[in-house]
Amino acid sequence: MVQNPYQNALLPAPVGGGYSDPDYWIWCGSVVQGEDGAYHMFASRWPKDLGFGANWLFNCEIVRASSKNPEGPYTFQEVVLGRRGRTFFDGMNVHNPYIRKWNQTYYLYYMGTTFGGPIPGPGDEVDSSRFTEVWNRKRIGLATAPSVFGPWTRCDEPLISPRDCSHWDCTATTNPAVAIQPDGTTYMLYKSRSFADGPLKIGVAKAPRPDGPFERILDDPIFNFEDPNIHLEDPYLWYEDGKFRLLIKDDFKNGGPGINGIWGAGLYAESAGCIHWEFAENPVVYSRHVTWSDGRQTDQANCERPYFLLDENNHPTHLFLATGEGPAPYQFSRTWNMVIPLR
């Protein structure tokens, strides 16, 4: 039986920590210690006047913010990836940054997409058919740099694309989560589904180097459930003490029980080879209920896109989460990336 080493590992979240910007919706958040000794967060953002809604898919860019310590607050430094033209697979929108460093090179994995037609502006509604069309164009991309400060070189082709419609992952490839071994062998988890509003599932691929070529090592998703209301997304993958380890969001639908009955919770699982996974007996690492450094306790509208900062032994020291305030999930007054130190 798998035990959860992070079941009671979270310390209070620093008030004012993480990364926020009053003029932007902030989402995602992936942190690495740079060659300068500072901590650098790669996050997603889009202008506040556009609304939260669908604009993470139409008007998002990836930025870098930095702090002298892991808790922050992080200060905006630059736009790292933005629009580059409709002819590129990632030319109109980028999201889901996931940063790794190996052999003196920084690898920034992300989701990119493109679309035709008008770019949504303030007050514009995006109907469900257009949203689904662009959602299905999501592909996993990669940018590399010799320094956390750049310059960044973007790959012109996706690292992994959907398969034909005889497979479960025929719509999109998105939400990359990557673990790089010392010899450069790289494992990637990705999200997909077989039809609009179908169950969100996770696949696995492997490459000899962090930049590919990636080949699937399992034809099926890493988890299969009979209940179509069980959705899993936002994987975070790492390798520690001879095991692959996973933190993933329980995103169950239609009032179903999910894996553990707590919607939006982050769940822990382990695997010997990144193929056959087992959830811990008590899998919850975090939920939307947060304890803050000033003693307050709140129920956040969302806590998503989990990312562990790892030390030199690949052991997690801090948990980063995209979060927001509001009366219900995705009904936000503001969003930011928060940080929770671990015991």
PLM regions and their residue ranges:
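Carbohydrate-active catalytic/glycan-binding domains of CAZyme proteins
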Residues: M1-R343
